[in-house]
C-alpha cells in the first residue's frame, strides 16, 4: 500500500477554487453556538465572502474570500464590530499562545473555586434564620440586621465581579439584539440582585426585619459560580482537542544526518532540502520522505499505516517521515521536507476535518435568541399593563403601586431565570461523561455524547482494534519426526534477541510454555531474509522463502503453506542445511469481544465497515469471521478519510474506531471518532471518545449511555420549560386576579430553584446506568 504515491494534498488542493484566498482566524470572545451563528450569518451575507465556517471547539474561523471584492483586514473589522477579537493564525506564536491559554485556564479554575466557596458561605448565611443554623452573633439578623444584609451584599458583589465577563458579554450581545447564554445569565442574576437591593433598602427604610426572607443575593451568586465552573470544564475539553495536531507534528524528527562532502553532518530538520542525502542508522526515526538509494532494512511504519509488522525496504523503495528504521543503515534521497511530508499532510487533514465538522447546535442557545427578549418584553409589558390598570382605577391594589409593579417585573424575570434551562444539557452531560469514565469510556465532550446517539454506521480499523494488533503463533507444522515443542525450542533460540514482531512472537510463545532454550553459535541476521545459526553443531535457517532459496533449499512445500496463507496467516520457515523441516504460522488474533460487539451492533441495525492497510486476503478472512458487512483492504490514511467522508455524503452518521496515526484523519472527519486506549496518543487525541481498556465491547455501552443521556436531556429541557412557561403568567399577576395576592419574588425564586433541582435530580439518575 505504502509503495503507491499517497497524494494527501489532492483533497486540500481541490478546495481552493478560482482566485479565492483563505483566511484563518482565532476569534476571542466566542462563548456559545449563538455567537458562532451570528458571525457565520454576518460573513456569509458579506459580498466577496465565499465561505465562512467557525468552529466552537477551538474558536477558529476558516474563511474563503475573493480578494478583488474584499480584503482580509475588512473581514476582521466586520468581526470586531460584532464584539469579538479576531487574530490571524500566522500571527500567533504556538508557544506563547499555549502558555497564554494555560495561564487563562488556571485563572478560570481559581476564580471558579473562589466563587463556589463564597457562594456556599453566602447560602449558609442567608438560610441560617430559616433552619436555625449557627452564625456569628455579629451577623445574627434579629440583633444585627444591617450586618446580616451587608455581608450578603458584599459577598454577592464579590462573586459578580469575579464573573464580570458574563455581564460584559451578555449585556453587550443583548443590546446588539443577539442574546446568547451569557445574556440569560446576566439578565437572571441582575434581576435577583436588583430586587435584593430594593429589599435591602426597604428593610432599612421601613425597619422591617421580616423582609430579609425576600433577599436573593445568594441566588445571583450561586448561578454565577455554577456557570463559571461549567465554562471552565468546557474550556478544558476544548484545549484537549487541539493537542492532536501538535502531537502529529512532534512525531517528526527534529534533526537529520546529512551526507555532505563525504562526511555525515547533523542539521536541524528545517534546514534539509530536496535532493539532500540523509544517512539513517538502525533504530533511528526517519526524518523525511524519500527514496532509498543505498542499503536495505525493515521499517516500522506502524505510526503511519497502523500495521504491526515491519515492511521490508530495498533500494528505490520509498520511506516516510515518522516511521522507524529497524535493523539496517540507509541512505535516502529527500523528496519531501518538513511541511510536505506524509505525516504533515495527515496533520493538515486532521486540522481540516476538525474545522469543517459542524458543531452540534445547542438547543438552549437557539432558544435564547427568542427566549430572553421575549421574557424581558413580557416583564416590561406586564409591568406597564398593571401600572395602566392601577392608574386608571381598573383594578385596585392594597400596596404602593410602584412596589406592586416592580414586584410583577422582578417576579417574571426571576421565575423565568435561565438557570434550569442552562443546566438542562450540561448537567446531564456532566453526569453522563462521569458515568462513562467509571465504565472505562472517556468521552471528551458533550458534543460527542450527543452525536453518538445518532450513529447508524461504524467504521473499524482492523489492526489493534478488532484484532490484538500483535502477531501470535497459531500453528507449528513439523515436516519431519521432530515434535512441535522441539521446533518451537529451536526457533525461539534463534529469535532470543529479536526485535522483529514475528521473531518476538515466536520467542514469547516459548517463554509462555516455559521452554528452556539452546545456546546459538555463529549467529547471523540477514536483513529482509531471516537468521542463521548453529545449535549443537547443526546449522539452522529461520526466515522467509528468500533465505532458504539463497541457501539452495528448493522444496518449500508451497502448496501446503499456501493453504495457511489463504486463512490470512503469515509463515516462518525453519530448515537445516539440507531441507525444510517445519514452518510456523502466525496471525494477528481477533479480539475475543469483537464478535459479540458486531452481533450487538447488527441487532441495533448499525452497519459495520472494516478498513485496513493489510492485504485483501487477510482482511477478508477476519471480516467473514466477525460478520462485518463490508471490508476495504490495502487503504492509505487518505483512503480511510475519504471513505468516512463518502459515507457521510450518503447521509449516514458515521463513527470511526481506530488506534493508529493513520486513523487520525478519519477519526477527526467522522461524526464521532473512537480510539482504543491502548493505541497511539495521536489516535487518542484525535478521537472524541477513548476506550480506556482493550474491551471494544464498551463501544456498545457508550452508544447505550449516549442514548440514555440524550433522553435525559430532553426530559430536563421539558421540565425547565414547564417551570418557566407555567410560572410566567402566575408571576405576571394572574394569581392576583383570583386571590388578591401577588406571587412573591421569594416564591418565584423557589419555583426557579425547584426547576433547577428537578433538572439536577433527573440528571443524577444517570448514575444508576449499567
Annotate the PLM regions.
Residues 14, 107-255, 366:
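Transmembrane helix-loop-helix hairpins at the membrane interface
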Residues 11-12, 18, 22-24, 96, ...:
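Juxtamembrane coupling segments of multi-pass membrane pumps/enzymes
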Residues 1-147, 263-264, 344, 348-356, ...:
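Flexible metal-binding regulatory segments at protein termini and peripheral loops
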Residues 97-118, 169-192, 347-381, 455, ...:
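Soluble-to-membrane junctions at the N-terminal ends of transmembrane alpha-helices
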Residues 20, 37, 58, 537, ...:
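Conserved ATP-binding TGD loop and adjacent catalytic N/P-domain core of P-type ATPases
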Amino acid at each position: 500500500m505504502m509503495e503507491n504515491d499517497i497524494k494527501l494534498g489532492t483533497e486540500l488542493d481541490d478546495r481552493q477554487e478560482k482566485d479565492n484566498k483563505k483566511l484563518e482566524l482565532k476569534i476571542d470572545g466566542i462563548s456559545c453556538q449563538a455567537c458562532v451563528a451570528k458571525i457565520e450569518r454576518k460573513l456569509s451575507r458579506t459580498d466577496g465572502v465565499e465561505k465562512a465556517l467557525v468552529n466552537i471547539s477551538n474558536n477558529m474561523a476558516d474563511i474563503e474570500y475573493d480578494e478583488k471584492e474584499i480584503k482580509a483586514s475588512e473581514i476582521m473589522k466586520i468581526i470586531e464590530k460584532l464584539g469579538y477579537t479576531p487574530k490571524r493564525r500566522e500571527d500567533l506564536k504556538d508557544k506563547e499562545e499555549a502558555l497564554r491559554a494555560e495561564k487563562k485556564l488556571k485563572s478560570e479554575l481559581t476564580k471558579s473555586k473562589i466563587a463556589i466557596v463564597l457562594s456556599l458561605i453566602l447560602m449558609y448565611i442567608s438560610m441560617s434564620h430559616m433552619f436555625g443554623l449557627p452564625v456569628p452573633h455579629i451577623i445574627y439578623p434579629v440583633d444585627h440586621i444591617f450586618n446580616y444584609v451587608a455581608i450578603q451584599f458584599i459577598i454577592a458583589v464579590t462573586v459578580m465581579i469575579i464573573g464580570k465577563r458574563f455581564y460584559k458579554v451578555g449585556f453587550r450581545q443583548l443590546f446588539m439584539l443577539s442574546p446568547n447564554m451569557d445574556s440569560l445569565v446576566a439578565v437572571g442574576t441582575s434581576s435577583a440582585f436588583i430586587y435584593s437591593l430594593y429589599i435591602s433598602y426597604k428593610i432599612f427604610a421601613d425597619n422591617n426585619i421580616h423582609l430579609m426572607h425576600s433577599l436573593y443575593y445568594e441566588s445571583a451568586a450561586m448561578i454565577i459560580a455554577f456557570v463559571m465552573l461549567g465554562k471552565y470544564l468546557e474550556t478544558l475539553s476544548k484545549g484537549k482537542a487541539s493537542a492532536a495536531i501538535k502531537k502529529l507534528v512532534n512525531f517528526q524528527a527534529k534533526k537529520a544526518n546529512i551526507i555532505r562532502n563525504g562526511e555525515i553532518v547533523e542539521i536541524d530538520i528545517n534546514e534539509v532540502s530536496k535532493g539532500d542525502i540523509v544517512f539513517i542508522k538502525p533504530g533511528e526515526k526517519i526524518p523525511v520522505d524519500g527514496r532509498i538509494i543505498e542499503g536495505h532494512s525493515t521499517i516500522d511504519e506502524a505510526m503511519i499505516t497502523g500495521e504491526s509488522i515491519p515492511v521490508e525496504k530495498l533500494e528505490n523503495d520509498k520511506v516516510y517521515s515518522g516511521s522507524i528504521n529497524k535493523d539496517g543503515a540507509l541512505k535516502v534521497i529527500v523528496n519531501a521536507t518538513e511541511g510536505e511530508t506524509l505525516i504533515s499532510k495527515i496533520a493538515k487533514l486532521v486540522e481540516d476535518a476538525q474545522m469543517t465538522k459542524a458543531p452540534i447546535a445547542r438547543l438552549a442557545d437557539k432558544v435564547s435568541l427568542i427566549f430572553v427578549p421575549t421574557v424581558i418584553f413580557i416583564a416590561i409589558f406586564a409591568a406597564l399593563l398593571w401600572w395602566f390598570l392601577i392608574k386608571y382605577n381598573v383594578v385596585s391594589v392594597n400596596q404602593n403601586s410602584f412596589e406592586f409593579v416592580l414586584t410583577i417585573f422582578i417576579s417574571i424575570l426571576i421565575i423565568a431565570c435561565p438557570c434550569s434551562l442552562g443546566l438542562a444539557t450540561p448537567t446531564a452531560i456532566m453526569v453522563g461523561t462521569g458515568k462513562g469514565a467509571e465504565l472505562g469510556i472517556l468521552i471528551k465532550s458533550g458534543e460527542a455524547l450527543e452525536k453518538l446517539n445518532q450513529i447508524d454506521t461504524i467504521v473499524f480499523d482492523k489492526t489493534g482494534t478488532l484484532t490484538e494488533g500483535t502477531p501470535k503463533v497459531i500453528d507449528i507444522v513439523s515436516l519431519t519426526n521432530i515434535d512441535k515443542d522441539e521446533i518451537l525450542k529451536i526457533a525461539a533460540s534463534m529469535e532470543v534477541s529479536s526485535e522483529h514482531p514475528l521473531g518476538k512472537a515466536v520467542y514469547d510463545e516459548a517463554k509462555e510454555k516455559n521452554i528452556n532454550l539452546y545456546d546459538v553459535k555463529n549467529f547471523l541476521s540477514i536483513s529482509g531474509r531471516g537468521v542463521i545459526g548453529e545449535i549443537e553443531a547443526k546449522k539452522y535457517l529461520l526466515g522467509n522463502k528468500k533465505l532458504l532459496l539463497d541457501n539452495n533449499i528448493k522444496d518449500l512445500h508451497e502448496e501446503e503453506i499456501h493453504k495457511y496463507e489463504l486463512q490470512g496467516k503469515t509463515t516462518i520457515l525453519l530448515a537445516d542445511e539440507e531441507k525444510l523441516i517445519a514452518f510456523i504460522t502466525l496471525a494477528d488474533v481477533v479480539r475475543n469481544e469483537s464478535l459479540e460487539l458486531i452481533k450487538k451492533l447488527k441487532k441495533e441495525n448499525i452497519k459495520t465497515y472494516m478498513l485496513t492497510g493489510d492485504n485483501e486476503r487477510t482482511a477478508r478472512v477476519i471480516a467473514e469471521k466477525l460478520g462485518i458487512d463490508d471490508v476495504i483492504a490495502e487503504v492509505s490514511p487518505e483512503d480511510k478519510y475519504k471513505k468516512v467522508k463518502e459515507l457521510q455524503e450518503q447521509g449516514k452518521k458515521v463513527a470511526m474506531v481506530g488506534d493508529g496515526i493513520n486513523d487520525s484523519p478519519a477519526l477527526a472527519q467522522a461524526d464521532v471518532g473512537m480510539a482504543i486506549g491502548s493505541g497511539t496518543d495521536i489516535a487518542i487525541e484525535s478521537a472524541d471518545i477513548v476506550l480506556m481498556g482493550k474491551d471494544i465491547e464498551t463501544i456498545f455501552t457508550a452508544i447505550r449511555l449516549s442514548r440514555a443521556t440524550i433522553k435525559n436531556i430532553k426530559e430536563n429541557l421539558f421540565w425547565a420549560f414547564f417551570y418557566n412557561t407555567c410560572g410566567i403568567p402566575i408571576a405576571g399577576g394572574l394569581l392576583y386576579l383570583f386571590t388578591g395576592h401577588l406571587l412573591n419574588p421569594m416564591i418565584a425564586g423557589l419555583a426557579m430553584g425547584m426547576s433547577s433541582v428537578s433538572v439536577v435530580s433527573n440528571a443524577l439518575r444517570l448514575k444508576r446506568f449499567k
